[in-house]
Amino acid sequence: MSVCLAVTKTVAVSSLGIYCGMLTSACVASYAAPVDVLTQLAKPARVIARVGGALAAVSSAFFALSYFGAPAHWRHPYLLYGMLVAPVSAAYVAVVARVRGAHCRRACEKRRAQSASVHASTPASAAPEPALDDSVVDLGAAAAAAESAPETHVTSAEHVPVSHHVTPASAACARAAARHAAVLLLPAAAGLLGSVLGLYGEGLFV
């Protein structure tokens, strides 16, 4: 079955180019932006990651259609290389998610074990009863102190906006996300470069 190679290759290379551009922007933002900004943008980043994954899947599908739906003399290797970008990226993401999940489970089990050992080593002790002398209060002195104490009123202008606190865990997560984005960029850039050079050289070097 023959397909319109001009259309399928255009869609494949365009989708791969947009996906590669999104990864490049993610890498630059991950290394240039402060950690507190990255933690605030975690939710939009997940949406962008889903869109990028969809573009990579579309690119691989059209590369496969261009390769397997074309005559034998038009089945160039760069189509296979472009088709493998999404599967390789998906395999890397799956391995990272599996390793991270195992690490989180081990950390949770370690925290639970430490919490159980702390509770076991510190039994609850009875609270000491207050002495009778300590319970006697001079009401006259207390009233005089209350009258002489200056009143402090907090106005709305004194409220300072609370900044987002960056924990070590969130900083480590941001650094890991930057490394993973850089790793994912390598096969995407290689596939895009091979596709562009392959399209350019189809009529010249075959």
UniProtKB/Swiss-Prot annotation:
Involved in the selective degradation of mitochondria via autophagy during starvation and at post-log phase. The chain crosses the membrane at residues 13-35, 51-71, 77-97, 181-201. InterPro entries: ATG33 (IPR051668). GO terms for cellular component: mitochondrial outer membrane. Belongs to the ATG33 family. It is a multi-pass membrane protein. This is Autophagy-related protein 33. It is found in: Mitochondrion membrane. It comes from the Eukaryota. Keywords: Autophagy, Membrane, Mitochondrion, Transmembrane, Transmembrane helix. The gene is ATG33. GO terms for biological process: autophagy of mitochondrion; macroautophagy. Its main location: mitochondrion. Disulfide bonds: none annotated.
